[in-house]
């Protein structure tokens, strides 16, 4: 019984579901797809209408990009960029941006 409780606690504290993204691949995708508006590292957007992505939680980034891709989140510009991305690309981008330093402090 004790082992079961410990296993459940480890699963609950074990991090998020998107930890498998590859940050190096995400950087390469970012350079091609995201850099013009958000900056390669996501910390220096081109304008105030573009959010800072650096340091954002990876699960939030996966959800946001997936929602743009599906149309659940309405933004025609982001939909156009998200449409060609595969699930793995989205996870890799999330790993890249979440690993970058940011001056912002994100709360859960």
Residue ranges and their predicted role:
Residues 20-41, 56, 106:
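Sequence/structural segment immediately N-terminal to covalent heme-attachment motifs in c-type
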Residues 27, 43-70, 79-84:
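Gly/Gly-Pro-rich "capping" loops immediately C-terminal to redox-active cysteine motifs
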Residues 70-73, 82-108:
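C-terminal capping alpha-helices of c-type cytochrome domains
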């Amino acid at each position: 019984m004790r082992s079961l409780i410990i296993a459940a606690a480890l699963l609950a504290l074990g991090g998020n579901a998107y930890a498998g993204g590859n940050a190096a691949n995400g950087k390469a995708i970012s350079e091609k797809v995201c850099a013009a508006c958000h900056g390669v590292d996501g910390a220096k957007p081109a304008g105030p209408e573009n959010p800072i992505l650096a340091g954002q939680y990876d699960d939030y980034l996966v959800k946001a990009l997936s929602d743009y891709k599906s149309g659940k989140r309405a933004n025609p510009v982001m939909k156009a960029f998200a449409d060609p991305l595969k699930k793995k690309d989205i996870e890799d981008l999330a790993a890249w941006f979440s690993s970058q330093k940011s001056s912002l402090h994100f709360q859960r």
